[in-house]
Amino acid sequence: MSTLEFIKECQEKVFSGNHITAEDAEKLLNIPEENLKDLARCANEITRDFNGEKVDVEQLNNIKKNACSEDCTFCGQSAFFDTGIETYQLPSPEEVVSKAQKAKEEGAESYCLVAAWREPSRTDFEKVCKIITEINDKVGISVECSLGFLTQEQAKKLKDLKVKRYNHNLETAKSKFPEICTTHTYEDRLETLGIARDAGLELCTGGIIGLGETREQRLELTLELARLYPEEVTINILVPVPGTPLELQTDLPNSEIVRMFSVIRFLLPESVIKISGGRETNLEDSGEELLQSGANGIITSGYLTMGGNEAQKDHAMIEKIGLKSQ
């Protein structure tokens, strides 16, 4: 069987409602370079078949930029590293509502509230709940949250407030995780995802590629994501932050990024697969190729500690390649 025939066989499994195996995924991730376009094309056909031409466009609000207690080696907001990043406390509900309204007017269909802490204190959680209530009452945009570790009570409260989706990234493969973070475990992250799922929240999870992991470890992360089967996968591409242990990390080749997104699509045909942080910095085309290689979502107008494309530019890019953003 030729490589192209194998790719098509895997695609047919997906179209037939079956799952490809871990062995299939490994072979797909390791296909020869000359077949990479075949892999991307078939992943794109899966995306269109299961999800249509719509691209999920999201905006973030880093509502608390903090000196976080965790030592994640990629993060410019960790208190362990001297990165010179400005910190600030939770803004007023009025400030967040204004930004959420602007995001809606710019074509975002979801608005994610993100906070840099291990987990929310009781006081901070109550403030976030008030912000969510105000957005629901005054804006009417789909609210998502990324607030760190959750208790069962907090997850239930978010569900009661009509939060659609909870983000909590695995960050990397389990075998790589101890090199990336020592202040909590991989199991801690899985536990929070389970709590969110049990409360009825949709899941958004993923990680960062380009941390120095091997291709095998990217496969490991991908298979764990497939096991969780989240409604949304978010993949960041490392942008090294000066002052962090990964400040000198070399860029991941574009072909490795395409492989990752394409194989995730074979494993998760129905999920939103979102190109997140590092899109503009690492991809010369700002994601055009990936949106035709398995991805069907982007974050626009900036990230947690860095800027990004203006929404208008991203919507134009989506339309340029024949897809729809609204």
Swiss-Prot record:
The keyword ATP-binding does not apply. The keyword 4Fe-4S applies. [4Fe-4S] cluster binds at C68, C72, C75. GO terms for molecular function: 2 iron, 2 sulfur cluster binding; 4 iron, 4 sulfur cluster binding; biotin synthase activity; iron ion binding. Its cofactor is [4Fe-4S] cluster; [2Fe-2S] cluster. [2Fe-2S] cluster binds at C112, C145, C204, K274. Its EC number is 2.8.1.6. Coiled coil: none annotated. Keywords: 2Fe-2S, 4Fe-4S, Biotin biosynthesis, Iron, Iron-sulfur, Metal-binding, S-adenosyl-L-methionine, Transferase. One of its GO terms (biological process) is biotin biosynthetic process. This is Biotin synthase.
